[in-house]
A protein has these predicted regions:
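Beta-sheet repeat architectures centered on beta-propellers
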Residues: 11-26, 31-169
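Surface-exposed extracellular loop regions of Gram-negative outer-membrane beta-barrel proteins
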Residues: 1-9
């Protein structure tokens, strides 16, 4: 495959091959300083809102820690920056807000880029079990799941008006 460099943006880059993911909103990528989104020629920093909590990303790339994944069912960008996967961040594209999660599946040690399973769940390779495992179940009531978020979009007619009613469980 031949690649052509389209443009160079000074001070912004992709740190690792697992630090980039394609989303319906554009391409998301991460480096030591930030998580960014590029849409065509427009570049925006997504991580600006959570800088106060992490003071710059502390990425452990040599240990296979950094990974970005997009979860299509709940419209979230998941950022794993810790080798032990004790803390992850999720960016919700609908609300344009960040959430901090701890102890996904109580497993820890997830690495590699996330994959989408047949039932549209976000998965990653666990070094603890040496298997590909789901990080969380967005469509279950499993009490062991960390992220128990269900959404459903309702249409109330009037197609010319934008409206959304979301129910959280």
């Amino acid at each position: 495959a031949n690649f052509i460099l389209e443009r160079h943006i000074a001070g912004v880059g992709c740190l690792h091959k697992h630090a980039v993911v394609d989303t319906p909103y554009g391409i998301c990528f991460a480096d030591h300083r930030q998580v960014s989104l590029i849409r065509g020629t427009e570049l925006s920093e997504l991580s600006l809102l959570i800088r106060d909590t992490y003071q710059g990303l502390d990425l452990e790339v040599n240990r296979g820690a950094l990974a970005l994944g997009y979860h299509p069912l709940i419209n979230n960008l998941v950022v794993n920056y810790s080798y032990d996967a004790v803390v992850m961040y999720a960016y919700n594209f609908d609300t344009q807000s960040w959430a901090k999660f701890t102890s996904f599946n109580n497993s820890g040690k997830f690495q590699s880029q996330f994959e989408i399973s047949d039932d549209q769940e976000l998965q990653s390779f666990s070094t603890r079990t040496n298997k590909v495992e789901s990080l969380f179940r967005s469509n279950s009531n499993d009490s062991a799941s960390v992220l128990l978020l269900k959404t459903k979009r309702y249409d109330f007619g009037l197609p010319e008006k934008f409206k959304r009613f979301t129910k959280l469980h």
